[in-house]
Every structure is written in structure tokens, then in C-alpha cells.
A protein has these predicted regions:
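Aromatic- and glycine-rich beta-strand/loop motifs that create alpha-glucan
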Residues: 1-24, 196
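Junction motif at the cytosolic side of a transmembrane helix
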Residues: 7-10, 254-273
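Secretory targeting signals
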Residues: 21-118, 135-212, 236-252
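Juxtamembrane membrane-interface segments at transmembrane alpha-helix termini
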Residues: 34-37, 214-225
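Helix-loop junctions at the membrane interface of multi-pass solute transporters
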Residues: 111, 122-125, 266
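Short helix-to-coil transition segments within interhelical loops
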Residues: 124-132
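Short hydrophobic, aromatic-rich alpha-helical segments embedded in or entering the lipid bilayer
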Residues: 222-239
Length: 273
């Protein structure tokens, strides 16, 4: 079988790699765009901290009606309000999903860092096994194990966190969960296929870089743009942001595109070692 050497220069000069990375970023962005919405809605939490010893002022700041003696009572009243609970629990779900993705990245780092996939692929190729056999015996089991780890951690977080599904509007919770499951599938496919098509450590760096960008970008946008003033002027409406149904649809499409493109790149590579 012919041998193709992939150097850092050749990889960074390949437009297909950037296209694959752009698809991953799009999946992350559309799936976690609610972080910007959530952070905007909770932009006043820092101000609330100043009224920690004055529950009445904190309640007015949070838009909660009633008489309260402690901040715990204010917080419970805020969370129990159906109009607001959805955003609180969505933030919990997003943070739990990010923790689950971190476990998947750590698992991938251990697998790739030890060279398990590369050594095993080389052995199969030397024995005359075809590329489909390599994918069937190595890549697909790896992708499955990584997904199970991520989804399992998410299920564990859901089991231990105080998430009350009944506080979500009808259909909101399952669509949010579906969106995250699709995003984790896109991320796993990106890492696995890119590790085979290009280089494992490049895939790890791109994956971590994309995750870091998604985590930092909403906060940077929120600090750079006067969202409060724009909203008061009617120029920015958080209600115009994509909802869970739209984000799930976009994430599904991006997942499919990323998987197909990644598979095409990996199958075109002449050397998997």
C-alpha cells in the first residue's frame, strides 16, 4: 500500500481540514448558542451579589415578587417560576454536557496518546487487511466507546442534579437533550475521523481549541456588545435566538456533514499509521 506523509504544513494548507473544523465549530455554536442567551439573562447576578444581605432588594433586582427573609427563599422563588426555570435548567444541562464532553476528550487523549489506534492499524495493514476492516475493528468501536462514555456521564449528571423536567415547556427538554446528543456525536466523529485522516494530536488540538473557543466566545461577545442597552432600545431580542427545535435540526445536519466529510478524508488517506 502506498505511503503518504502528512506534515504540519501540508495539513494546515489543506482546505478540507478547515472545512471540517468549520463544521465542528458550527455544530458547537448552534448547539450552545443558548449560552449567550442564558448569560445575558443572568447578567445581573453579579449585581445581585451586592444585595446578598438585603433579600428584598435582591428580589426586586431578580424580578421576583413577595416578601423574603433570606436569599435562599428568593432563589427558590426565582427557580420555581415556570417562566424562568427553563433557562436555569438549560444552563445546568449545558454545563453537565460540557463536563461529559471533557471526559470524552480525556478518554480520547488516553487512547490516542498511547498510540493504541495507530499501532493496531499498522498491524492490520501489514497483515493485508483492507481499509474497511481497519475501520470496522478500530475506528467504529472507538467512536462507540467514546459516545457511550459521554452519554453515560450526561445520564449520571441528569440523575444527580436537581433537574425537574416538568418545569420545561412541552417538548423543550427532549429537544435540548437530542441537540446535545447530536453535538457529542459530531464532536466524536470529528475527532475520530480527523485523527485517522490527518494526525491524532492535531485532531486533539483542534478539538480542544474548538471547545475553548465556544466557551470563551459567548462571554467575549457579551462583554464587547452592550446587550442591555441594545435590548432596551429594541435592537436586540433574545427571543430571536434559535430555539431547541432549530438548534437540534442544525446540529443534526452538521453532524451528518461532518461525519461524511471526515469519513471521505479518512478513506482517501493512504496511510493510517
Amino acid at each position: 500500500m502506498g505511503r503518504t506523509r502528512y506534515t504540519l504544513r501540508s495539513i494546515l494548507g489543506d482546505w478540507r481540514f478547515y472545512l471540517l473544523l468549520a463544521l465542528l465549530l458550527a455544530a458547537f455554536y448552534f448547539g450552545l448558542v443558548s449560552r449567550l442567551d442564558t448569560r445575558y439573562r443572568y447578567r445581573h447576578f453579579a449585581e445581585i451579589a451586592r444585595f446578598a444581605n438585603v433579600p428584598g432588594q435582591a428580589a426586586r433586582q431578580m424580578g421576583v415578587e413577595g416578601r423574603f427573609d433570606t436569599m435562599e427563599q428568593v432563589w427558590e422563588a426565582y427557580v420555581d417560576c415556570p417562566e424562568r426555570a427553563e433557562y436555569y435548567y438549560l444552563a445546568v444541562l449545558v454545563n453537565a454536557s460540557l463536563a461529559g464532553s471533557l471526559t470524552g476528550v480525556l478518554f480520547s487523549f488516553w487512547i490516542i496518546g498511547r498510540g493504541i489506534l495507530g499501532r493496531r492499524a499498522s498491524q492490520l495493514l501489514l497483515r493485508g487487511a483492507g481499509r474497511p476492516a481497519v475501520f470496522r475493528q478500530l475506528l467504529f468501536p472507538y467512536l462507540g466507546a467514546s459516545l457511550l462514555l459521554r452519554w453515560g456521564f450526561f445520564a449520571l449528571c441528569f440523575a444527580v442534579l436537581p433537574i425537574r423536567v416538568q418545569n420545561f415547556p412541552p417538548g423543550y427538554f427532549p429537544e435540548t437533550v437530542l441537540c446535545w446528543l447530536l453535538l457529542s456525536a459530531a464532536d466524536t466523529a470529528f475527532f475520530g475521523f480527523t485523527a485517522f485522516a490527518f494526525h491524532p494530536y492535531l485532531a486533539l488540538g483542534a478539538d480542544l481549541g474548538a471547545a475553548a473557543l465556544v466557551l470563551l466566545l459567548p462571554g467575549a461577545v457579551r462583554r464587547a456588545l452592550p446587550l442591555g442597552a441594545l435590548n432596551d432600545a429594541g435592537l436586540w431580542r433574545t427571543e430571536a435566538l434559535p430555539g431547541p427545535r432549530q438548534t437540534a435540526a442544525v446540529a443534526a445536519g452538521v453532524t451528518l456533514l461532518a461525519s461524511l466529510l471526515g469519513a471521505w478524508l479518512a478513506f482517501r488517506r493512504k496511510d493510517l499509521s
